[in-house]
Regions:
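Hydrophobic alpha-helical transmembrane segments
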Residues: 1-168
Length: 168
């Protein structure tokens, strides 16, 4: 019996659910606000508790995005390993590491929202710039394209994670 489709579906569901939790609940407010900061377009973050203000430039934006990706990838790794263990799927450690590397690196590339960043440039090249800039009627084009980017790469990550998978 070929269990690979079921293993893929399991890995994808776990990675996707973990990504939503990591992106929307685990990510800190400061990382969400500062991860796109550059020296040319700094972000001033005001702590909601202390009202202390911190200005983030390029290095601070990179650190904020990197920390977000660390927590994002750790969340995905924890959920993927725990979930597959509960479901009786044995993943190869190297495949899991590869999957998390794909997810984490591509997440950083998309989330480092510098002016004219990767997703904005891709939107321009594919004729989606107007959608990327959409921010009315309850829609946010940049966010929708960001999530589509993550879903696509998580599909590849799930395929990678299940390479050599078998039953426990």
């Amino acid at each position: 019996m070929n269990d690979r489709p079921a293993h893929f579906g399991t890995a994808y569901a776990l990675l996707r659910a973990a990504a939503d939790v990591a992106d929307h609940w685990v990510q800190s407010d400061v990382c969400a606000q500062a991860k796109g900061a550059t020296d040319a377009a700094p972000v001033v973050y005001e702590d909601p508790k202390t009202q202390a203000k911190t200005t983030f430039g390029t290095s601070g934006g990179r650190r904020a995005c990197a920390w977000h990706v660390v927590t994002y990838t750790a969340t995905q790794g924890l959920v993927l390993v725990a979930g597959t263990r509960v479901l009786g799927v044995r993943l190869h450690p190297a495949a899991v590491a590869g999957a998390l590397a794909i997810s984490g690196l591509t997440h950083y590339a998309a989330d480092r929202r510098v002016p004219n960043g990767l997703l904005h440039r891709l939107a321009k090249k594919t004729g989606k710039e107007r959608f990327y800039k959409l921010a009315n009627f309850g829609m946010n084009g940049a966010y929708a394209l960001d999530q589509a980017w993550h879903h696509g790469w998580e599909t590849l990550a799930a395929l990678t994670a299940t390479a050599g998978a078998n039953r426990r």
